[in-house]
Amino acid sequence: MRNVRVVAIQMQCAKDVATNIQTAERLVRQAAEQGAQIILLPELFERPYFCQERQYDYYQHAQSVAENTAIQHFKVIAKELQVVLPISFYEKDGNVLYNSIAVIDADGEVLGVYRKTHIPDDHYYQEKFYFTPGNTGFKVWDTRYAKIGIGICWDQWFPETARCLALNGAELLFYPTAIGSEPILDTDSCGHWQRTMQGHAAANIVPVIAANRYGLEEVTPSEENGGQSSSLDFYGSSFMTDETGAILEQAERQAEAVLLATYDLDKGASERLNWGLFRDRRPEMYQRITD
């Protein structure tokens, strides 16, 4: 029996990078005290969700893995606490900018980087202004405690993401996220968001862990953003499922949270074999997906 203790962290993001890193560290330490071995923080937690507006100055936030403050900080924390930490960050690689994850193993070493594949472009979720679509493909990391696959926010809406990660051997699926109110559509997408990922877990027989931010984030009108006045209310509701998609743990909409679940990885592997979903696949019939 291979058990792994996993945490999803839900936090509010302040305007100051140092404050957000301190908050994240406090919650990571709290998770480690509860026995967590793999800890997921939300998407782009270093700052407010800057993609709500378009400002050329924000390109300066992008950094390489070696330069990024959060990555370098949490390499030390991961080694001290012996935990795996996927860290979301705004990546600069030469002249190209990405929305990325650096996976830090429990020895403090960076195993590699995943770059977000699907880049949204909607009212106040204006990510195409800041990010180039990722070129890494869907990657799975063999960490000290489990083989983990990671998609970033909008990736979670695409079943292809989860299926590719499962085919690549992921035992757990992680989705760091920044999602909240819809500025144009008169809808609360929270339930839809959760059910989409529950379906990925059920269809692949792999647990899903989703970590979101929470709180109201407002944009102040300025000459640089064309006088935009707007706000997004991030609805939290981070959650963790089992391999059938059933929700094991869920956070409130507007509160800090450290969600903890224990997964039996051998049980998950056995269930995937028993159900035969991967045995009975017919890839030769799926050409329409890539047309």
Enumerate the predicted regions with their spans:
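Residue-level detector of high-confidence beta-strand sites
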Residues: 100, 113-115, 175, 250-252, ...
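CN hydrolase (nitrilase-like) catalytic-core segments centered on the catalytic cysteine
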Residues: 66-86, 147, 153-257
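Cysteine/selenocysteine-centered motifs that mediate thiol-based redox chemistry or coordinate metal-sulfur cofactors
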Residues: 138-168, 268-291
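Cys-nucleophile CN-hydrolase/nitrilase-fold catalytic domain and related Cys-dependent amidase chemistry
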Residues: 17, 26-113, 179-206
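A short, polar/charged loop-to-alpha-helix boundary motif
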Residues: 116-130, 255-273
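N-terminal active-site segment of His-dependent metallophosphoesterases
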Residues: 1-38, 174
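Active-site-proximal beta-strand elements of phosphoester/diester hydrolases
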Residues: 3-13, 100, 140, 146-155, ...
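Short, glycine-anchored, charge-dense loop/turn motifs used at functional sites
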Residues: 6, 103-111, 241-248
